[in-house]
Amino acid sequence: MAQYQLPDDFFFGAAMSGPQTEGQWNQGGKLENLWDTWSIQDLGSFYNRVGSYAGNDFMAKYQEDLRTMKDLGLDTYRTSIQWSRLLDADGNLNEEGAAWYHELFRASREAGLEPFVNLYHFDMPTYLFDRGGWESREVVEAYAHYADVAFREFGQEIKYWFTFNEPIVEPEQRYQEGVWFPQLHDFSRARTVQYHISLAHALAVANYRRAYDEGAVRADAKIGMINCFTPVYTKVNPSEADLEAVRMTSGINNRWWLDLITKGELPADVLESLAEGGVKLPFRAGDQEILKQGVVDWLGCNYYHPTRVQAPASKIDQYGLPHFADEYVWPDAVMNESRGWEIYPQGLYDFGMDCIKNYPDLEWFVSENGIGIMDEYKNRDAEGTIQDDYRVDFVRQHLEWVAKAIAEGAKCRGYHYWAVIDNWSWANAFKNRYGFVEVDLMDGYKRRLKKSAAWLKQVATTHVVD
């Protein structure tokens, strides 16, 4: 088996989020977010009726988890501040919430881990959703204020900041595909949400730059965005209509955000096609100047699977709204049957090559990558250890393609695995387990290393992928 050497300064870490791990959802002054509200109103929408309440009990077990991450050879990890924990309903600092994050960041430094901090991970405070959510300019301004409070409260503690995790997902899952609460099917409203998130990002970056200039943020800090930059593919011998489907899918999902964070603008061809399709974005005078402030220092790329599309059978969907692409099922696809996702490690290499071609100055890292397996407990051996060689194979293959991309000039600086410790995953709850570390829900959220943990430690320590 071939060996691949990653650079000595290539970092390894864990990816997680506040709403998926922290627990204590209504303690310490925390307000409800949409996941809490949906759990209260319709617990049956969650796998095995496990709602948002406990996460993986991280607030009670953070010291143990930080030690475990360090013991596995990691030197960084990413989490998120919960908007609904940091601020009260008047936009003022919740001192108890702030104290928790100060303690977490202190303990992280003590453990020898550099925390990467994201400000938003699909966790809109419910009271703001009731005011219109991301369809409202008021909420855009509220987010910019929240970001400013966070930068100034933790600015001397945090080196790496991120405005959003996967900003394309809420427009799709909540407003377009009807998967998450409020379970809407409205392509046009989804694009309004996407546009307003773009403005919120840019306003947050502007607040960060201002705080930086005023010395409220440490001098070596960087700010970025994290998105699922999923390469878009089509048939081997595509028609012009197939290529048009690729252009629009990649344009909405990928180029929209890449152009925003590198150029401070949105792709003109995508905006033109949306307008031709009858999608009216809520442009206002001065918006272009706001978007220009959205350029960041670097980028996180979440990657689990590719996107494959073909020309749509109809350009209007069943709800009478624009439809730019149908799914294309590649006959040679290797699937993770638990998740229904294609496993295609080359996608990370292709993303790196696209950056070299179209965004040559952009530094990035793999901010999420992982494999979730259903009923993983069935793979437990006689000693109680989950045998998960499939996880080793998955990560090895992806890291091999990362190493190839770096060797060809990609500016990829590190790798965060999702999620090193099993965590709660939205409506799927604990259906699919991702971790190198098991969380036993039947035994007080007890942590146990899986077989793959030893391999992770070896790779993170040696930077050799074999």
What are these regions (language model features)?
Residues 61-82, 294-298, 358:
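Catalytic domains of carbohydrate-active enzymes, especially glycoside hydrolases
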Residues 51-58, 90-93, 139:
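Short secondary-structure transition/capping motifs
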Residues 32-67, 72:
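Aromatic- and Gly/Pro-rich amphipathic surface segment
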Residues 1-46, 89-90, 99-466:
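Active-site region of glycoside hydrolase catalytic domains
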Residues 57-64, 72, 81, 96-103, ...:
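Generic alpha-helix structural propensity
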Residues 75, 84-86, 122-124:
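A short acidic, glycine/proline-enriched capping/turn motif at secondary-structure boundaries
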Residues 9-11, 59, 76:
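A common structural microfeature
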Residues 81-95:
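Glycine-rich, proline-tolerant flexible connector loops at the mouths of alpha/beta enzymes
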